[in-house]
Amino acid sequence: MRMYQWIVISIIVFLSSHSFAEAKSKITVKVMIVSMFGPEGEVWRSHRVLDRLTVVPGLLPADSAVHCGRDGVCQVTTGMGYANAAASISALIYSRQFDLQKTYWLIAGVAGINPARGTLGTAAWAHYLVDFGLQWELDKRDAPAAWPSGYLGINTMSPAEKPQLIYGTEVFKLNDELVNRAFSLSESVKLTDSPSAQKARAVYGYAPANAAPAVVQCDTLSSDTWFSGTHLTERADVWASELTDHHAVACTSQQEDNATFAVLMRAAGEHLVDTNRVAVLRTGSDFDRAPPGGSDASTLLNYQSAGGFEPAVMNLYLAGNTLVQEIAGHWSAWRRGVPPR
C-alpha cells in the first residue's frame, strides 16, 4: 500500500513540476506585431531591437521565427491572404511557446485606400473589420440591369437587403477604448511622404486624396480577391455600411484581417488571448479607384508606380510604434487592460 502511495505521489510531483516548467518556459508577450509580408515586418525589425528568435512550426517556411525584444515586444510575419494569415496565427497561438493571455495585438499592414477618405501614406485605425468576400456574386453582365453591381448578400433578393450574418466572421467590432487611445497617441505624428506619391495624388484634385498623409480613424474591408475600380469599391463602401447598420465607414481594403481576427476569436474562447486587446492599423499604399476622368484599369495595373508603397510601410512604424511603446513602456498600467486617461 505504501509503495502504491509513493508511486502516485511521485507521478503527481512529476506532472506538476513538468507543468510548472512548461509554464515558466513560455515567452510572455506584451505586444505582438502582426505583419503580412517581408517589408511590413522589416520596418519593425530595423527600428526596434527584436533579436530574440523563436522558431515556430507551421509559420511561413521563409520566415519561420517570431522576433522578440527584451521589452516583451514581438513581431510575426503571417504571409499574404486568408489562408496564410489563419494558418500562421493558429500555428503561433497553439504552439504554446508564448503566453498571450494579456498580449496586445497590433495587426499592421499596407492597403488600398479610398481617395475620398485618405491618400497614399494615410494611416487608418479601424473600429470595424468587414469581410467583402462573403457575398453572392453574379457577373455584372448577368445581373439585373437595375443592380449597381453583381454583388448581393447571401440568401437575399437584392443588393440593398442586409443578409443574416450566418458565417460569424462577416463583421468584427474592435474595442473602441483601445482604438481611440491608439489614435490619440498617433494623431500628431508627422508621417513620411515621397515625391512620386505627391505627384500621383495631385491628379485627384480633391482632399483628402491630394493632401499630405495623416492619421485617421476609418474601417477596413477584407477579401482574398484584390478588388479595385469605381463600381466594386462603391459596392464595398455600401456593403460595410450595410452590415454594420451604417456605423462603419470603410476606407481601406486588404486580404487578411478578418481571417486573422477569426483565429484570435477562437483562441479567446479557450482563454488563450483577449480580443479586447486587438488593434488594426492599415496604411494607404495605392488608391482603390481612379481620379476623375481616369482609368480604373490603369490605376490598378500601374499601382506600383504610384509611389505610395514606401511611405505606407514606413508609416506603419511611425503611427503604430506610438501604441507599441506606450504599452511596453508602461506595462504596469496596461497589464490589466486599457488604462483610463
Segments the model singles out, each with a brief description of its role:
Residues 1-5:
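Positively charged n-region of N-terminal signal peptides that target proteins for export
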Residues 22-341:
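Accessory terminal and edge-of-domain segments that mediate assembly/interaction
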Residues 6-14:
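Sec-dependent N-terminal signal peptides
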Residues 14-21:
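C-terminal segment of classical bacterial N-terminal signal peptides
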